[in-house]
Regions:
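Alpha-helical residues within the helix-turn-helix
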Residues: 15, 26, 40
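Recognition helix of helix-turn-helix/homeodomain-like DNA-binding domains
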Residues: 29-44
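Short glycine/serine/threonine/alanine-rich loop segments
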Residues: 19, 30, 61
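Conserved hydrophobic/aromatic packing and binding residues within compact polymer-binding modules
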Residues: 10, 24-25, 35-38
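DNA major-groove recognition helix of helix-turn-helix/homeodomain DNA-binding modules
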Residues: 46-64
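Short basic helix-loop element that most often maps to the first helix and adjoining turn
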Residues: 9-23
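Short, intrinsically disordered or compositionally biased N-terminal tails of bacterial proteins
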Residues: 1-4
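Short C-terminal boundary/hinge segments that cap the last helix of small helical domains
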Residues: 58-76
Length: 76
């Protein structure tokens, strides 16, 4: 099963990790505007979302989705 990440989860995780859009873009190997577009809810390629998700997972983020709710946890 593939777990996807919503734009809201991306921004929640990025902010909780104290990362800028530049930080996430660099760690994911994508452009800063790509991060901004995704977090705004604009369409980006599935491969790009996966790069963003993996960068956040590598930093310890955990994404949850249950009963119509999404969430994120990060290490303290």
């Amino acid at each position: 099963m593939i777990i996807t990440m919503t734009p809201t989860q991306s921004k929640m995780a990025r902010v909780a990790l104290k990362w800028t859009t530049d930080d996430l873009a660099t760690k994911a190997g994508v452009g800063r505007m790509t991060v901004a577009r995704f977090e705004r809810g604009d369409s980006v390629a599935a491969e790009t979302v996966e790069k963003l998700r993996k960068a956040l997972l590598n930093a310890g983020a955990d994404f949850t989705r249950r009963a119509g709710r999404v969430g994120v946890t990060v290490p303290e």
